[in-house]
């Protein structure tokens, strides 16, 4: 069977949350765990759009908190595919605080490894990724390097057992 290919734009996702008092930690900033849930959901949406089935989060790389978000801030979360394997997909998620004037500044970045699952919760093949821009090709190369590092870390952990 010939592999189907989809573009990065086919699966992009963006969502907006308003930070409410129940989302705040003791320092009156957005609780990191809440943001992690939100970005995991966006990564899942991107991956589901690409593979057309269920997905699970396998790992999160480089989860970086750059700045805080506060009550009444609009938090914009954008996700896109950067790399795909046979059953796994890397999703880059960027998070911004948006001002009432529409200006955005990034507060978080993360890379999620998502795995497509069939009806028996076993990994299933995913469509390939058709790269259309120089930025997409560069993101793919960076995704390949992150994958190589993940595989080396896994090998090192297994060797230590």
Regions inferred by a protein language model and the residue ranges of each:
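Terminal targeting signals and extreme-terminal segments of soluble enzymes
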Residues: 1-161
């Amino acid at each position: 069977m010939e592999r189907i290919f989809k573009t990065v734009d086919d699966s992009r996702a963006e969502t907006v949350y308003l930070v409410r008092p129940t989302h705040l930690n003791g320092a009156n900033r957005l609780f990191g765990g809440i943001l992690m849930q939100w970005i995991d959901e966006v990564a899942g949406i991107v991956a589901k759009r690409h593979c057309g089935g269920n997905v699970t989060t396998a790992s999160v790389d480089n989860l970086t908190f750059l700045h805080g978000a506060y009550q009444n801030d609009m938090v914009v979360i954008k996700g896109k595919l950067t790399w795909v394997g046979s059953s796994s997909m890397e999703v880059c998620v960027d998070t911004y605080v948006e001002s009432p004037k529409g200006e955005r500044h990034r507060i978080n970045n993360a890379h999620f490894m998502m795995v497509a699952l069939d009806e028996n919760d076993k990994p299933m093949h995913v469509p390939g990724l058709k790269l259309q821009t120089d930025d997409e090709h560069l993101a793919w190369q960076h995704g390949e390097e992150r994958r190589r590092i993940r595989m080396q870390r896994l090998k090192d952990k297994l060797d230590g057992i």
